Amino acid sequence: MAPAMQPAEIQFAQRLASSEKGIRDRAVKKLRQYISVKTQRETGGFSQEELLKIWKGLFYCMWVQDEPLLQEELANTIAQLVHAVNNSAAQHLFIQTFWQTMNREWKGIDRLRLDKYYMLIRLVLRQSFEVLKRNGWEESRIKVFLDVLMKEVLCPESQSPNGVRFHFIDIYLDELSKVGGKELLADQNLKFIDPFCKIAAKTKDHTLVQTIARGVFEAIVDQSPFVPEETMEEQKTKVGDGDLSAEEIPENEVSLRRAVSKKKTALGKNHSRKDGLSDERGRDDCGTFEDTGPLLQFDYKAVADRLLEMTSRKNTPHFNRKRLSKLIKKFQDLSEGSSISQLSFAEDISADEDDQILSQGKHKKKGNKLLEKTNLEKEKGSRVFCVEEEDSESSLQKRRRKKKKKHHLQPENPGPGGAAPSLEQNRGREPEASGLKALKARVAEPGAEATSSTGEESGSEHPPAVPMHNKRKRPRKKSPRAHREMLESAVLPPEDMSQSGPSGSHPQGPRGSPTGGAQLLKRKRKLGVVPVNGSGLSTPAWPPLQQEGPPTGPAEGANSHTTLPQRRRLQKKKAGPGSLELCGLPSQKTASLKKRKKMRVMSNLVEHNGVLESEAGQPQALGSSGTCSSLKKQKLRAESDFVKFDTPFLPKPLFFRRAKSSTATHPPGPAVQLNKTPSSSKKVTFGLNRNMTAEFKKTDKSILVSPTGPSRVAFDPEQKPLHGVLKTPTSSPASSPLVAKKPLTTTPRRRPRAMDFF
């Protein structure tokens, strides 16, 4: 038994949805012929189910088409099928089944395929208007067509997706103006927008109301007073040439000027949706929109009355009434504005021209005023500049007079000693260079203070060398040498006077100048040479030693103790050990307290080493700086020897056991005293390269064995180790850690062994 033949509609649907383009193209051509043949009779033809099957095949025929140009061609071919239907009833059914298919399949369309279906909807709507146009815009056909649209798209019961509905509202007036803009009258256009008036008045969807208001009614308001483009261009050229006077400009021309920008916005709104026509056909080579045809004509008063009638019903929601009332007012204003005489428009235009002339005159006046202001400002600036130059010249003359006085009061010194007066001369030129100012603050200030401290008659005439601060001066970091010189100059001059008065240890300079001593000292400091007795300045004693004892007396034990901590403090301040400079203390109390503290520290150290006391007493007995430098070198060698573990002295371990035999052989006193030495602010570095502790071996597996016995306890706070890591040596000679290296006068000690370090 042969299988039953499938209906033709199903076969067309299968071939239309084929993946091969040739099969689809042949199916579309045969479908056109099939529709034309089947609808030749006035009654009958296709049923709704048959047309739904055909439209489903056409929908998926559009689905599988991928290239944009081919998509546009296929969409136009599908839209032209409505003209193949010879029966008017079949035509409306064909259009109705199209909207039903789009409503059913819309939610399954992905984002990449939306554009071609937007284009398909636009072209089908355009061809639907073409059907009405070919039938002469018959009212019966218009009514049936609008009923189909109302039922399948706009009505809430249609369950049409918002994408289909909103796109239909956006393109409705655009496609209607393209097809019937030249033929349709205001009454006919009112019938075409009547479904939107009904839906906007009774729907409860606020978004739909707003979309209808913007896409239909506000678009009508925006394009309201337009005239054909040919007359518009002619009138524009005439107005530009000045052939027409203000009274001869027609009413439409005035409204046209105001609505040129609105036309562009309306066209932009009509092409807002993404579709193939707006992308490819909507623009020509110059980038402008294609000709949309003549604009639709509307009776604004009739539109306002129709909206007022719909909103005056009791079942109209408040939101819809409020939104539509604004549109009603706009349409009423447009209807009233169309009856204004041409004279009023001419007066408005003349007033606008007068305003433009006045504004141009104001701009010219403002430009002249600005030029005058700039000229006045230039003149004022030149005057101010001249006054400033005069002031600067007068100030320079005054400064030069002061400099002459200073030159008469201060004698010149050759060589580097003359740096201070030259820098004082530059003090008057502070605005000229900030670098000289910084040098003046660093060098000239100690020299000025030294001259004022000599007590001669020139001290009263010289102002104190205080650095003048300026806001624009760059902050410069002072060198440590300049900082120490400032401190020395602040402390030393009265003490130098006390020394030079009774003892006469400060002779005058080579020319007897009051500042010669300070400048010579400065020059020698720069050269890095310390003067010895008999050449220039003698080495001054330390300030705390001058207060307690005579500077020229023999060295005593306490003074020798105080020199060592002061030398250590000086060593911290210095960058290198080769230069010997004075150290100024802030006050006498702090110096005495620090001195006493250091005396206690050094007394403990000297008790254990008698040689240190004899060596520390030599520098002051000699009275020269060479012994101080040798003492400092010995001190540094002693500290470095302690760090390198050259002496067998060992620190007290954290965990240790007392050696039984060590009590009888070695007295514990010195060791305890050495361990109890108070902490000082000295910096200690340890030479870890001599560390001989056993290195941990990664291959040692003893730690992997779990312990047994009492050591299995996780944590016992009372448990103590059996022995410490560091062990006290049983027989190690006790000696001081700070003993300086000297020639061995006694029997040499034995060489330390490895057991002495553990």
Curated annotation (Swiss-Prot):
Keywords: Acetylation, Activator, Apoptosis, Chromosome, Citrullination, Host-virus interaction, mRNA processing, mRNA splicing, Nucleus, Phosphoprotein, Transcription, Transcription regulation. Positively regulates DNA damage-induced apoptosis by acting as a transcriptional coactivator of proapoptotic target genes of the transcriptional activator E2F1. Likely to play a role in ribosome biogenesis by targeting serine/threonine protein phosphatase PP1 to the nucleolus. Involved in regulation of mRNA splicing. Inhibits SIPA1 GTPase activity. Involved in regulating expression of extracellular matrix genes. Associates with chromatin and may play a role in modulating chromatin structure. Interacts with the transcriptional activator E2F1. Interacts with serine/threonine-protein phosphatase PP1 subunits PPP1CB and PPP1CC but not with PPP1CA. Interacts with 60S ribosomal proteins RPL5 and RPL27, ribosomal processing protein RRP1/NNP1 and other nucleolar proteins including NOP2/NOL1 and FBL. Also interacts with nucleolar protein NPM1/B23. Interacts with splicing factor SRSF1 and with LUC7L3/CROP. Interacts with GTPase activator SIPA1. Interacts with CBX5/HP1alpha, H1-10, NCL, PARP1, TRIM28 and YBX3. The lineage of its organism: Eukaryota, Metazoa, Chordata, Craniata, Vertebrata. One of its GO terms (molecular function) is transcription coactivator activity. The modification N6-acetyllysine is found at K652. The modification Citrulline is found at R712. Induction: By DNA damage. This is Ribosomal RNA processing protein 1 homolog B. The modification Phosphothreonine is found at T728. The keyword Transcription applies. Residues 273-285 have a biased composition (Basic and acidic residues). It comes from Homo sapiens (Human). Residues 259-272, 397-408, 469-481, 566-575 have a biased composition (Basic residues). The keyword Cytoplasm does not apply. Its main location: nucleus.
